[in-house]
Amino acid sequence: MKIYPYNELKTRFAEYAKPGEFNITSADTFRIIRLHYDEKQGCLFAFCNTNIKERVLQFYFKVKLNLYSYKQCYDKHIFPSCRNKCISYTTFVAPGVEGNYLNKINVIKYERNKAAPSDNAACLDKFLHNVNRVHMQTPFVEGAYMRFKKTQRCQNNYVGGSTTRMFNLQHFNEDFELVDEMTLTSGIMPVLSCYDIETHSDGHNMSKASVDCIMSIGFVVYKNDEYAKFCFMYHKLPTQIPETYDDDTYVVMFQNEIDMITAFFDMIKITNPDVILDFNGDVFDLPYILGRLNKTKMLLKRYDLPAAAPTTKLFINKLGNKVDTYYFNYYIHIDLYKFFSSDSNQHKVENFQLNTISSYYLGENKIDLPWTEMVKMYNTRRLDVIAKYNVQDCMLPIKLFVKLKMADSVYSQCILHRLCTDDVICNISHLISVACFYAAITNTRINESTGKEEPDPYFFNKNDLSIISGQFKADKAAAGISNLKRKLIPLKNIPKDAINLGPANQTVKYKGGKVLKPRAGIYKNAFSLDFNSLYLTIMIAICACLSNLILCEDGNVYLNHNSRAIVVKLLLKLLSERCKFKKNRDNQSESAFLYDLYDQKQNSVKRTANSIYGYYGIFYKVLANYITRVGRNQLRLAISLIEGLSNDPEILEKFNLGSITFKVVYGDTDSTFVLPTFNYNEISNETDTLKQICTHVETRVNNSFTDGYKMAFENLMKVLILLKKKKYCYLNSENKIVYKGWLVKKDMPVFMRIAFRTAVEQILRHLDMDKCLQSLQTSFYEYYDEFAKSKSLTDYSFSMTYNDNPGKKRKSTDDNEGPSPKRRVITVARHCREILVNKGTDFVPGNGDRIPYLLIDIEGKVTEKAYPLRLFDPVKMRISWIKHMGILCTFMNELLEIFGDEQKDKIAKCFTAIMQKYMQNQLYDRKEPVLVKINQKKCSVKRKRDDDDDNDDDDDDDCDSSDSENDTQCANNTYKFCLYKMKK
């Protein structure tokens, strides 16, 4: 750690991002890192990187081009030609029937840089960023590799083209060539950076930008595999920081806070990163910086370009909460917290705090510096530890970005689906909307006379999706798709093979895939047969596309069987691309770069294809329901085919068996668990023969399918424990244990998950109930004895997601009609957050955050006992174990369901011993376990209700995941544990 005056630091880094003049030859490959379109100038700025002599060199160039948008034409079109020169497009949603009548929308294509801001704000493609439009209308794509056709001179990081003209889209082929990634041996990465702020407070309340200063701003740049670390610190009093030689951080002291913030912005321009990362920056850091600047604008500069203020866009998360997202124009800005919390692939981490994510992916933790201690250090001018803490918080996000190869992931989305780097935290429905918009407007058809492809454009009007999903209720008496202004097609003109989806004005309740109710128990040598991409296959088979919907005069909606529909072709293209990318990936035995590149691309294509079904679930549930209905029928057919192979002569002869039966013991949406029963003495090599039998069953079943349906043998389960629907675990033939839906929930304390899994492992590996219970008791005893000693408090905590979304609009003081709104429920998460706010902690959870907490041993309800883990002091507070014991009670009852009444006494003995241990020092809610007889009458009533709800004409064993779950119907036990208060 070395202290520098700011001017000296600027001089030291003056050449950091300025390589001087250099040539970029036609042999030098460069990568487009960031695109920015200036509507006022009608000019595209391309920020690029190239590797010359194993070092990253950065430059930019400008391209003169007009960017187009679309707006609806409302002219009455009395004359043959429109004065607005509009084009008539076929509507993407429910267009009608070709050859009879197709609904049209008249659209004006106009130049954005010449239009009024009001036109651009109200255009039909307003959900797109300008860079999305660049990707669709030009060959320039973020993440693409390119070369100049002629040697270019770079001066002051700018490549200006020839002396006679600047780069122009019309001369693209003269100036540029696209580079096939297959010809590359290494990638070109963006220069990364991350910042983080530390704020002051009075120690009792959370920091407020209106009164509390920014103590320090950490800033780290990662370039050429090296870190440049900075810490800008503010203190109104002259302060000395001891220099150290084991830390290469550059520290600059300021006695004026605004000067510090301005210097930070200036250092961004000097170091010139391509990507600026932060962690929860959209919610905390950026609004706080803006608050401290007060009326001064936040302006970011790059190269010699005009300074630009960040722009904001409203982001709605999965809980429906609204948060501003900040875009930095010349730079890529990514809030990693928002990225992780909105990405469905990140469900494995306990929560989305930086320490948790870093520990999971990197094996690194933040420096442990309590916020109250930091404020005390600042007040006594001991700033060196704060600087280390601040910089470490900047290092971890960069390491995560590199480790998870996020750059290639983001750029794959740009190249494959016309997304842009500003779409990185957008939800999956935005991705599908962008893909559908581009696929619709570039759609083609085969000319029957010439046999050649010709343009057949449709127009994707996102407003139509809002109407059919019920977001816009133009007619309150009607619902959904019936509100579309479409000409109804006569019944006689509906194609014969069209599928009737039901009334257009129906109110739809989503119904999920088929799930069998299993009998709880332990099964040996079961195997799973799963459909390959079931819903994708269904969507292709039935031609599921919004452009295939037909509104009929009889009041129904029909699905046309047109295999050339836009989404059907898109799905076929995605599946073909994935096969190609996987093949190319697997052929890369020498190039790790190409392997990773193709792996990212196949994952991107897979994610997009799998999301289209969910897209229908959001915007048109009728179609999603029909897809799941077909899926349920396919699962029934598969079960029938599998069980029909029992005692099949061909199987008996091939494997020298006297008899064999196949029973599907469980099924869920697209998978089946099959239990083969035969005399194991008749086979020599048990595992190999079982795998051969499974493969044979797979082949026989697939030979019976049509329309491209395929099943695959996935797992041979040496031991399978089935508990109930969507809750099971198994030991596979590779000796690996897999848990699905059971003992995986994040709201269960870590130590309990470990204890339960260790106990269950004794059953899976040894089939020994005694070892299971002994392991359980030992684990619980150990964690009780080591609480607040060798074990982390995090292992004992619960967590709950905080959601501040008020939901329905509350009644105003002027509104005298209608019922009064209900009082807001105080959840555990809300209660804990209020405590954190009142105590003034350094991190206050926002919407969607999971808040870790423990219960303290006081009198009251669970919500009143809840206390945030961050503030829990085991020296001053006594923990309440009652919620832990409630979870243990559930697990013990699950063991009863699996093993039945025969093991109830052993289980009760273990349960009682653990409860006595945990209740020994507790003052309130002291309870003990008691075995009680299950009320069979109530169970039968529940069975009757469940059977009545099943209208699929199935057997009683069948149900759908949308039906209410019946846990007792297939259980083996007639007793269960309940917790009763101990008698005093």
From Swiss-Prot:
Gene Ontology process terms (BP): DNA-templated DNA replication; viral DNA genome replication; viral genome replication
Residue stretches of biased makeup (Acidic residues): 947-966
Reactions that this protein is recorded to catalyse: DNA(n) + a 2'-deoxyribonucleoside 5'-triphosphate = DNA(n+1) + diphosphate
Region annotated Disordered, chain positions: 943-969
Pfam families: DNA_pol_B (PF00136), DNA_pol_B_exo1 (PF03104)
Subcellular locations according to the entry: Host nucleus
GO terms assigned for molecular function: DNA binding; DNA-directed DNA polymerase activity; nucleotide binding
SMART domains tied to this protein: POLBc
UniProt-listed Enzyme Commission number(s): 2.7.7.7
Record's keyword terms, sorted: DNA replication, DNA-binding, DNA-directed DNA polymerase, Early protein, Host nucleus, Nucleotidyltransferase, Transferase, Viral DNA replication
Location of the region described as Monopartite nuclear localization signal in the Swiss-Prot/TrEMBL record: 939-948
Region Bipartite nuclear localization signal, residue ranges: 804-827
Any one Gene Ontology cellular component term annotated for this protein: host cell nucleus
Function recorded in the entry: Replicates the viral genome, host DNA polymerases cannot substitute for the viral enzyme in this process.
Record-stated family: Belongs to the DNA polymerase type-B family.
Protein name: DNA polymerase
Gene field: POL
